[in-house]
């Protein structure tokens, strides 16, 4: 029985690695005007703060280094009805701050952000070809399983320390919500499956950026368009 359990766990991406603890990033904090953020509740319970991750802008590029898992947003960035939010994420040195792949991506439908009742949905990519669709409502929820899914559209880094880039988009179109990565729709859900108790209050709301712990990513082309 123990052997069977061990084989099962070893088959799950990321389970082979011990969970690396979040670290404090020197010179951390949010220095992009108008923006703020919130780290995950479990990070707060462990004594981490928003200043343990670093978020700054250089030219047209947003630079993020975590630290604790975190969401960043500008309260002025709101979207409603049908829309698409997209950005390009570059991990300059894959897995340089962690011992296994960590994801990064976009969130939409942000309501009551920064409070204990916040809700939002995010789609995030890993540099190993996987993606996840998850959210908070306010408890964490998963839309595509424990470890996410692999998809050929998601770029894979050539190796540890090598760069990998993903273009990620979340779209609301009528009664559907779609996540696209590198131009391919990788997940599609009925809005009714997301706007419900324990998940989103609405797909209307603030949009922003989401990062796992101990990750270094550069973001370009972040914005929203109406369809």
Please report, for each region that a protein language model flagged, where it lies by residue.
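Carbohydrate-binding surfaces in secreted/extracellular proteins
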Residues: 87, 160-194
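Secretory/extracellular carbohydrate-interaction modules
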Residues: 66-143
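Beta-strand-rich interaction surfaces with strong enrichment in secreted/lumenal proteins
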Residues: 71-77, 152-160, 208-209
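Low-complexity, Ser/Thr/Pro/Gly-rich disordered linker/stalk regions
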Residues: 19-96, 176
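Short, aromatic/His-centered strand-loop micro-motif at the edge of beta-sheets
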Residues: 141-167
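Bacterial N-terminal signal peptides
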Residues: 4-15
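Flexible glycan-contacting loops in extracellular carbohydrate-active proteins
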Residues: 189-221
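Extracellular beta-strand elements of beta-rich domains used
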Residues: 87, 220-224
């Amino acid at each position: 029985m123990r052997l069977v359990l061990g084989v099962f766990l070893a088959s799950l991406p990321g389970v082979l690695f011990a969970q690396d603890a979040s670290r404090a990033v020197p010179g951390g904090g949010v220095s992009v005007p108008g923006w703020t953020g919130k780290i995950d509740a479990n990070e707060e319970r462990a004594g981490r703060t928003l200043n343990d991750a670093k978020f700054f802008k250089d030219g047209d590029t947003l630079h993020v280094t975590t630290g604790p898992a975190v969401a960043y947003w500008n309260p002025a960035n709101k979207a409603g009805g049908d829309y698409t939010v997209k950005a390009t994420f570059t991990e300059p040195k894959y897995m340089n701050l962690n011992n296994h792949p960590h994801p990064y991506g976009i969130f939409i439908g942000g309501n009551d952000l920064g409070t204990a009742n916040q809700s939002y949905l995010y789609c995030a990519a890993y540099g190993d070809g996987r993606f996840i669709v998850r959210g908070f409502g306010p408890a964490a929820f998963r839309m595509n399983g424990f470890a996410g899914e692999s998809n050929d559209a998601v770029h894979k880094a050539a190796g540890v320390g090598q760069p990998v880039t993903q273009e990620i988009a979340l779209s609301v179109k009528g009664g559907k919500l779609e996540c696209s990565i590198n131009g391919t729709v990788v997940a599609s859900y009925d809005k009714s499956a997301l706007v419900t108790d324990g998940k989103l209050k609405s797909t209307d709301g603030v949009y922003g950026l989401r990062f796992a712990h101990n990750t270094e990513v550069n973001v370009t082309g972040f914005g929203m368009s109406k369809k």
